[in-house]
Amino acid sequence: MLKFTLHKKDGYARRGTLELNHGKIETPVFMPVGTYGSVKAMNPQNLHDIKAQIILGNTYHLWLRPGLEVVEQFGGLHGFIGWDKPILTDSGGFQVFSLSDMRKLTEEGCTFKSPINGDKLFLSPEISMKIQTVLNSDIAMQLDECTPGEATREQAKKSLQMSLRWAERSKKAFEDLKNPNALFGIVQGAMYEDLREESLRGLEQFDFPGLAVGGLSVGEPKPEMYRMLRAVGPILPEHKPHYLMGVGTPEDLVYGVAHGIDMFDCVMPTRNARNGWLFTRFGDLKIKNAKHKLDKRPIDESCTCYACQNFSRAYLHHLHRTGEILGAQLNTIHNLHFYQVIMAEMREAVEQGKFADWQARFHENRARGTD
């Protein structure tokens, strides 16, 4: 089940509601990444506290560990991980294609060696749909060939054509399995605007309830990613949700929303948190730096997260320098809370028709820097 309602537009920025089998999501939305069924350093209550509406699980990793037979015993990923809100799963393709020296690609699918025990494994559109059906994610993704940003035109065209054939197979398998959830198609085409449009037009025949933009944030220069967003975002179908995969910084989220994107996921806020890199309204802060050793202030005096309401920069600096687990948890709570606040503010700005003003103020504040 998927029902998307578009409430308001302000330029290309959109404010909507996405209804799924495990609940309703207000868009634009950021989805914390729970690769192995766990958002690193966060428990489900932490996620509820920061107002996370939906999280992402990784099909490839959950297939390898704990394995489908385990998750199936719990009726799906929700029961296994104790999360009652929506979940989106990727197709597993990105991770498999990252194993460039351990995989073989054919029209049928991809053969690769398990990085865990060396077993020979095979992933196809049909197998990806079977895995995601067992996981019972509210949103599943088609299997696509993940095109590197530096692909030649010929490589990108050949790749997107295979992804379109796999889109058809993914949809058929999804329907044959009687999966009650939603399946998204993925727009590919590397850094070629006309190929992106060709991919989008090719997907129209399958009438997926939502569409994702894939193959960005894969090593290409930032201006190239933004160029593709400017080209693709505004031509995505208005009545469907738009998902930008694997992106990104706070600035990337704002740029994406400004160009018609509704959904985002990225490991950046959690990974950076574990490395002591904190996002704030007034720029980024590196908590490991010695200047924070005696600082009694919170990370961000305007922030209402648990970390900022209760602890000093000095304490967080100490936790990071000593490698305490609590430091990673508090940093992660703060970063994910900050991302959720940005999304909530953008939703409100679009509702009020003041997105451009909000965007200008956001960039002005972020450029100011922390002290």
Curated annotation (Swiss-Prot):
Q: What class of enzyme is it?
A: transferase
Record note on cofactor: Binds 1 zinc ion per subunit.
Q: Which domain of life is it from?
A: Bacteria
- Catalytic activity field: 7-aminomethyl-7-carbaguanine + guanosine(34) in tRNA = 7-aminomethyl-7-carbaguanosine(34) in tRNA + guanine
Instruction: Give TM segment ranges.
Output: none
User: InterPro entries under this entry?
Assistant: ArchSynthase1/Queuine_TRR (IPR050076), TGT (IPR004803), TGT-like_sf (IPR036511), tRNA_ribo_trans-like (IPR002616)
* Residues annotated for Zn(2+) binding in this entry: C303, C305, C308, H334
Q: Which HAMAP family match?
A: Q_tRNA_Tgt
Instruction: Write out the similarity annotation.
Output: Belongs to the queuine tRNA-ribosyltransferase family.
What name does this protein carry? Queuine tRNA-ribosyltransferase
* UniProt organism field: Neisseria meningitidis serogroup C / serotype 2a (strain ATCC 700532 / DSM 15464 / FAM18)
